[in-house]
From Swiss-Prot:
Gene Ontology cellular component terms for the protein in this record: cytoplasm
Keywords recorded for this protein, A-Z: Chaperone, Cytoplasm, Nickel insertion
Family: Belongs to the UreF family.
Summary of subunit composition and partner proteins: UreD, UreF and UreG form a complex that acts as a GTP-hydrolysis-dependent molecular chaperone, activating the urease apoprotein by helping to assemble the nickel containing metallocenter of UreC. The UreE protein probably delivers the nickel.
Recorded GO MF terms: nickel cation binding
Protein name as annotated: Urease accessory protein UreF
Localization (cell): Cytoplasm
Length: 224
């Protein structure tokens, strides 16, 4: 079987985990006129990529995938707890928890998940997105690096979808912005590979403040 199919499946917006229900603070950034056009949108996304994802979220996701791929359940549990403790707002915690639950329901109904991984998933009370993503990659025999690339692409695609609904940003403008951001996506993956999870960290105050404000936003398109 062509391995690219499994990778496309994991990165597909058709994966039923609800990722396109959330904006990760971007809707509030538009509401507060921090993001007003393609240029400011590009700055917001590039800052998130290089100052947050590349330094913390992506290394942690990669650590999940490496532990799951190797069947190192103790290490997977450890990084899973680190991920859970790092959610800075209620909104971000619930987002990760809901998407993790959706992945759990999906994996429970699939024959590809092996017995050890299924047992680990059953013993996990509240699986979050990174954990579910790592187990899905194991089930579909996707390498940790490819699973990280799929996750980064899904994140970027979701941010662009948010912009098309809120800014609004046209499809052609979104594609031009994608071309500008793809090198940064690659840079984020490389940085994540070099980052030890023991030293990983970021101070994404803008994201946290936007997320907290979004929890109280009067009118919104995306979930909180």
């Amino acid at each position: 079987m062509n391995s690219a199919w499994a990778l496309l499946r994991l990165a597909s917006p058709q994966l039923p985990i609800g990722g396109y229900s959330y904006s990760q603070g971007l809707e509030m950034a538009v509401e507060q006129s921090i993001v007003v056009d393609p240029q400011t949108a590009g700055r917001w996304i590039s800052d998130q990529l290089l100052l947050n994802l590349a330094r913390f979220e992506a290394p942690l996701l990669l650590a999940h995938c490496e532990a799951a791929s190797a069947g190192d359940w103790g290490q997977l549990l450890q990084v899973s707890e680190q991920h859970r403790a790092s959610r800075e707002t209620r909104e971000l915690h619930q987002e990760s928890r809901q998407m993790g639950y959706s992945l759990q329901q999906l994996l429970n109904g699939l024959p590809e998940l092996d017995r050890d991984a299924r047992h680990f998933l059953e013993q996990t009370a509240e699986p979050h997105l990174a954990l579910g993503w790592a187990l899905a990659a194991r089930a579909w025999q996707i390498s940790p690096q490819d699973a990280l690339a799929a996750w980064l692409w899904s994140w970027l695609e979701n941010q662009l979808a948010v912009l098309m609904k809120t800014l609004p940003l046209g499809q052609q403008a979104a594609q031009r912005l994608t071309s500008e951001l793809l090198p940064l996506l690659q840079q984020a993956q490389v940085n994540a590979t070099r980052q030890d999870t023991h030293h990983a960290g970021s101070a994404a105050f803008g994201l946290s403040l936007a997320s907290m404000a979004h929890e109280r936003q009067y009118s919104r398109l995306f979930r909180s």
